[in-house]
Amino acid sequence: MSQRFFTQPSQDLVYLDANATTPVLPCIADVVSHTMQVCFGNPSSSHITGVQAKYLLEQTRNKARQVIGAQNGDILFTSGATEGIQTAVVSTLLANRHKATEHSVLLYGATEHKAVPNTLKHWNEVLGLGAKVLAIPVDKDGLLDSQFIAEHVGQALMICTMAVNNETGVYQDLGALEKVIRAHNPQVSWMVDCVQALGKQALALSDTTIDYAPFSGHKLYAPKGIGFLYIRENSPYTPFIAGGGQESGMRSGTENLPGIAGLYELFELLLDSKQAVFKPVCTLHQYRDQLISALEQTFGDITFNAPLASTVPTTLNFCVNSLTSKEVMDLFDAAGIRVSGGSACSSGASRSFVLDAMGVSDWQSENAIRMSFGPAASAADIALACERICALKPVLSNHCLIVSDAHQPEQEVCALGLTQLRHQGSCCWLFVADNNDAVIVDPIVELVPRLTRLVKQQQLRVKAVLETHRHQDKDSARSLLAQRLEVDASGELGWSHGEAIALGSHQLSRVTTPGHSSDSVSYLLSQNEHIEACFCGDLLVWGGLGSTQFDDASCEQMAQSLTLLSQLLEQNTVICPAHDYEQCFAMTWQAQCQASELLAALLQGEVDHEQFALRKDQLDQRQGEQSGALCGFSLAPVKASGAQLSAQQLQQLLHEHSDSTVVLDVREPYEHGATDIRSLFTLAPEQLINIPLSRLANALLTQQLDKSKHYVLICRTGNRSGQAISNLKALGFEHVYNLQGGLALV
């Protein structure tokens, strides 16, 4: 095989994302390869090679009928489920075009795959039907609202539901739905997405009034690019692809015979009662129970987002109640475990629309993990998955991500210094002195459980829980966290310590810095009379200034506060704002002044306070027009990117500059601990350091990085390392490189 293709990683892969796609079974791959090389004829050709190909095509069609229980109707081979959905929708809407009225509706389940509502909306607009596209609500268990269907299906041109949900595994009672649908509209076209039902549920489509049922091969061990569509006898049909008249004129284009051969082998397995590849449902339930046990043993506090009693056993949708989905997925990926955050086709979304429709909490929707395996999973596959999941518990406990059962907590890792904790665009800061004295600045409600666990597990002595002002965009977490940590919160914004708070060899002092709000303050962290960090709240955002659009804000007071800070801070003082809309993570006062044109103009005397206020007001108006960021707006220049290095180029750089080249892993410590980077690149101990993005500000504070060295940054995919490179470039680091594609492409 050409080296441009990826090879199996050295560690055994634990693949638990079967609802997204599956590997092709060896026996199916053999048949596909054989068809490509031997039975490669065009089914439309009249010679023997073509006749043989046609025979394979029709035999596969007959097998499909047996698998889905379709003695009648048509089986149409497609490129996949999405084409099948298009075909069903276009056929129905064209047939009902003349029936459309101002009251017509198109119904779909609120938890359907996005391919369904998007297709309905697209063709409704293109064909000019003007029907209302309505989502059928679901209850907390993900089951469709039968009453809603009864009230609206009478006006429906089409209704679309699904057999099994791809995110939660919830299955619908198709018999009960059929009764409701046909009782109120016997003629309406009904499409059922059966993609996730194939191989997991018994199907008898000819015994139903389902008009269309799309299927996909790659969700069940067949190749990508092949699927099929069941069309009920006498249901409307219009060819979606015209041309040479293949598939009896129903779908033109030379058939994907290798893919169809793959389906043939798949159907053979599904129909063979003696085969041992696909496991019985009882075995799949046992597999699920094993995975649940491993998850609960490792993570402890878990919420399952759908009732297990009404889901297929091959799908688990859950959230870890103290970890974000990104943290869980990054940890799993580092350990060679593949899962997803919801639907793979909707991975860009920050919430799950499926779980939102079910009415779960914000935390569940934002942090859902989908773990799915296929019905051909073996006992050894599941045992390895459970072993790998359970092996993560020491990593989690060592980094305070779960409650540890260690008897000597002092042996666990404690991140001394400055740590940034984030939720969406908000930042919370934890500083831990060398004697375990600690202070928390601008806590976030969503992070209270994590902060509480971290403080108690590491036996930190929290001297204060502080806010820099009363935040406009979020509820205050200060009182709640202080109560849980039994810290005095009686003072203004949590400050009740006189002039300073002692934190080991450090001191924390307070200065009033109004502008963003009238009560804004900044906290200055100093050691040996040097101010090392400034917790400035929303007076500053990285590369810009805080908003002055609130009722108690003042541009002139902001100018005075910034002038005061310029007199107190040093060039290398680390700036710690309450928001980070630019994914910047770490900034010094010097870099901040260079990045903010208006700040520089003020401090250099190019504008007075009145002129500053005028220009700041103009910037705020631009913020309102251009930015969704509530508390600040950055006008910093486009971020610089570092050179991209392949793994081979990295090795060459290490060879040529071994004394000055360092591999910098910017993943979180729990990810770093789950991957043997040193062996992967043959690194000496001094050639590898781990500074996660959450600790990049601390690296500035402690001067851990040397601008004369070459740093090759790595992470899982190259995204986080790319952000860190932009950050380091802004701080004056010239020799920084990104591992192209991250560890995923090594």
Show where each model-derived region lies.
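Active-site metal-binding motif and surrounding structural segment of the metallo-beta-lactamase
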Residues: 446-492, 500
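Accessory terminal helices/loops
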Residues: 398-421, 425, 560-662, 668-670, ...
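Pyridoxal 5′-phosphate
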Residues: 1-415, 422-424, 478
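Short hydrophobic beta-strand that contains or immediately precedes a catalytic carboxylate
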Residues: 15-18, 77, 440-442, 513, ...
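Catalytic cysteine-centered active loop of the rhodanese-like fold, especially the PTP/DSP P-loop
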Residues: 468-469, 691-693, 699-746
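Short amphipathic alpha-helix with an adjacent loop that forms part of the alpha/beta core around
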Residues: 145-155, 450-458, 499-504, 652-656, ...
